């Protein structure tokens, strides 16, 4: 893929991460989950398009919006 597409994907990932952090400022245990997903997005680059549904499902477990056990 082109560099510009990768930059767009990166920018969208950063924007989403900032939005999620804003919504979860009182849940410090969720920061590491967000950082891991952000790093995953950067590393996977162009493959991110296929992984978006999987990442979103990981971010929304049935029991709670964020599961601190992911960080252990």
Curated annotation (Swiss-Prot):
Lumenal side: 1-2
Compartmental location: Host endoplasmic reticulum membrane
Gene name tied to this protein: ORF4
Other facts: TGBp1, TGBp2 and TGBp3 seem to act together for cell-to-cell propagation. TGBp1 is the main movement protein that physically cross the plasmodesma with the viral genome. TGBp2 and TGBp3 would facilitate TGBp1 function.
GO CC entries: host cell endoplasmic reticulum membrane; membrane
Keywords for the protein's UniProt record, in alphabetical order: Host endoplasmic reticulum, Host membrane, Membrane, Transmembrane, Transmembrane helix, Transport, Viral movement protein
Family indicated by similarity: Belongs to the Tymovirales TGBp3 protein family.
Lineage of the species this protein comes from: Viruses, Riboviria, Orthornavirae, Kitrinoviricota, Alsuviricetes
Function per UniProt: Plays a role in viral cell-to-cell propagation, by facilitating genome transport to neighboring plant cells through plasmosdesmata. May induce the formation of granular vesicles derived from the Endoplasmic reticulum, which align on actin filaments.
Listed name of the protein: Movement protein TGBp3
Pfam family of the protein (one): TGBp3
Domain of life: Viruses
Database matches in InterPro entries: TGBp3 (IPR003411)
Residue numbers on the Cytoplasmic membrane side: 24-72
Transmembrane domains' residue ranges: 3-23
Disulphide bond pairs: none
One record GO biological process: transport of virus in host, cell to cell
